[in-house]
Design a protein with these regions (language model features):
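A conserved hydrophobic position in a structured secondary element of the catalytic/binding core
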Residues: 10, 110, 152
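Alpha-helical scaffold within the catalytic cores of cyclic-nucleotide enzymes
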Residues: 32-47, 63-106, 131-144, 165-166
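A structural signal for short, well-ordered beta-strand segments
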Residues: 7, 57, 104-110, 185
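Catalytic strand-loop-helix junctions within cyclic-nucleotide turnover domains
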Residues: 60-71, 106-126, 143-146
Length: 201
């Protein structure tokens, strides 16, 4: 089945290095506590967690227009900003005690995905595949390089409400899967757009 959705990848930056000082049980407890702050923001924005990838999250948002003609919730931008707010709360409540200050990167891409049952005979799960997924993953990886917490593709940026779209600026283009995608950082309150002047921010 093919469907238009927004795919989110979110990952803790340098997680392996950060938790080297912890024992395995504390690592798991710390990670589960962090995820308990992130997941509600995804659910509140109309998305759902497809999978946990170690310290990473893959989430999906139905991109069908919501009531009032907006797809902001479906695009996951609201979730991304909520996750950044939740991260500040997590850092204040937990990370300081552990001597850590977490940072995350979030990539969002809207487009067609293929949904199906994936796996071998002994382990099957519903999953999504396609270029849309690959581009979202690539954007998440580029957030560290460009020094921004959230990166969107042009198709995602165009689907935002005017208010959210006003928080974006064109940054660069990235070649993925044989085509070029524009990238836009998303800045929220207390989250200035921190990119090179040549990018127009």
């Amino acid at each position: 089945i093919q469907k238009e959705m927004t795919v989110m990848f979110a990952d803790i930056r340098n997680f392996t290095t950060l938790v080297e000082r912890m024992d395995p049980k504390h690592n798991v407890d710390f990670l589960n506590s962090y995820l308990s702050y992130m997941e509600p923001e995804i659910l509140a924005a109309g998305g759902f967690v497809d999978s946990y990838l170690g310290d990473g999250i893959m989430a999906l948002f139905d991109s069908a227009p919501a009531s009032g003609g907006t797809t902001a919730l479906a695009c996951g931008a609201t979730a991304a900003l909520g996750m950044l707010r939740a991260l500040r709360a997590f850092n204040a409540n937990h990370s300081a005690r552990a001597g850590l200050q977490l940072q995350i990167g979030v990539g969002l891409n809207r487009g067609l995905v293929t949904l199906g049952t994936i796996g071998g005979a002994d382990r099957l799960k519903c999953g999504v595949i396609g270029d849309t997924v690959n581009v979202a993953s690539r954007l998440e990886g580029l957030t560290k390089r460009y020094g921004v917490p959230v990166l969107l593709t042009g198709s995602t940026q165009r689907a935002l409400t005017p208010e959210l779209r006003s928080r974006t600026r064109f940054l660069d283009r990235v070649r993925v899967a044989g085509h070029v995608e524009p990238m836009y950082p998303l800045a929220g309150p207390h989250l200035p757009c921190r990119v090179h002047d040549s990018a127009g921010c």
